[in-house]
Amino acid sequence: MIKYDYEQINKSEFVRVIMINFLNDIRNAENPISNNRKLINTIAILFLGIALGTFSKYLDFRQTELPGVLMAINGVLDIGNFLGRFAIWILIALCISIYSNSAIRASINVFVFFVGMVASYYLYSNYIAGFFPRSYAMIWFGFTAVSPLLAFVCWYAKGKSKLAFILSALILAVLFNVCFVYGCWYFNAKSVLEVIVFIIGLIVLRRDTLRSSALMGTISIVLAVLLDDFVFVDIIYCEK
């Protein structure tokens, strides 16, 4: 019995080492930072999520009572509806993930961001606006729950391997589908802000050479068209 347990431990350790080496071949963790810095970064990201979630719902609920300048800007750019769609939140989560110190830190930071954003948005909706859109809330709660796993994977997209390249193209494909609407005979951006989001996403995910970046962009469009054919992808078009 003891021998069996010992062998199992060896097997588990072997698998763990193989997995670590596999992930490190994609992207290595950055230089370590202190625990205090980790805590400060995470708290800052939490408050960023709370601020953006509150601001998003404020624009949505008070759009006819906004201050003059903000109302003018919102009238031109339709910021309220833009913040109610998925593109900007995917971009922010992507940036938080990629620029985190490690894949684990990416998971923690992105999860904390969405907890702050989603909680503040729906608390404002329920207690100030006076209504709670349960169906949309459940979608966002579910997305928040899986965000650590998605962030963990996204962190590796800035690696140097072929798998990192594929991950970057796949992420950009999802971003393409939430920024643009298209079919056999038409192609439109949802708004100028979504165009900016996609451009920033392309810059963030860019490769070492212009040729590689162009190839990534091309592959991402092909993947976007393929993904658009799947019914489950429609969930990412939801609004809050």
Model-derived regions: residue spans:
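N-terminal topogenic module of multi-pass integral membrane proteins
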Residues: 2-118, 122
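Hydrophobic core segments of alpha-helical transmembrane domains in multi-pass membrane transport
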Residues: 44-56, 174-178, 198-202, 220-225
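Hydrophobic cores of alpha-helical transmembrane segments in multi-pass inner/ER membrane proteins
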Residues: 87-97, 143-155, 195-201
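Central hydrophobic cores of alpha-helical transmembrane segments
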Residues: 108-117, 166-175, 211-225
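Membrane-proximal helix-loop-helix units in multi-pass membrane proteins
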Residues: 119-188
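Membrane-water interface at the C-terminal end of transmembrane alpha helices
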Residues: 149-164, 202-216, 224-229
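Membrane-helix boundary connector in multi-pass membrane proteins
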Residues: 180-191, 198-214
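Juxtamembrane boundary at the C-terminal end of a transmembrane helix
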Residues: 225-240
